[in-house]
Amino acid sequence: MKKILVVLVMGLIMMFNGLCFAADGNDLNKEQKIAEDFMQVFWQEQLPNYSKISENLSGKLKIDLNEKQYIDLQKNVKDKFGILKEAKFYSFQRFDQGDRVSYLVSFDKQPISTIIFAFDKNQKLENYAIVPLQKKTK
């Protein structure tokens, strides 16, 4: 009887723990979707609609990345890095004031880079950065 009770209690504890971690998964899914929508600017010839993208930008980023700058972003990235060939999800980091989602990407001119997306507590995109990775030379 005691063994059955212990097994039952352990099962309930495991179910409760699974529920506690579910929020992180939902946040990650939403933030990945926002990041992938934003990265469409690097994939496609025709830009995604700015009004759709701007729905998920924080107030500060909406000011810093207006519609004209958004249009210029594609040209600037293509000039500096080339055309985006591949993007793979790399990491999800949770912080007190927001989250960070990172992708390993490959461009024509820059074979290995990272695109980092920073989100606030409300899952609005606060900032992004494209960081080229260089091989260490001996």
Tell me the role of every PLM-derived stretch.
Residues 1-4:
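Positively charged n-region of N-terminal signal peptides that target proteins for export
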Residues 7-17:
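Bacterial N-terminal signal peptides
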Residues 17-44:
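Short, low-complexity N-terminal intrinsically disordered segments enriched in polar/charged residues
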Residues 41-44, 83, 134-138:
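Acidic, low-complexity intrinsically disordered segments
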Residues 48:
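Conserved short acidic donor-positioning loop in nucleotide-sugar-dependent glycosyltransferases
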Residues 51-90:
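Short solvent-exposed beta->alpha transition segments
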Residues 75-116:
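Surface-exposed, charged secondary-structure patches
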Residues 112-138:
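Short beta-strand edge/turn micro-motifs at domain boundaries
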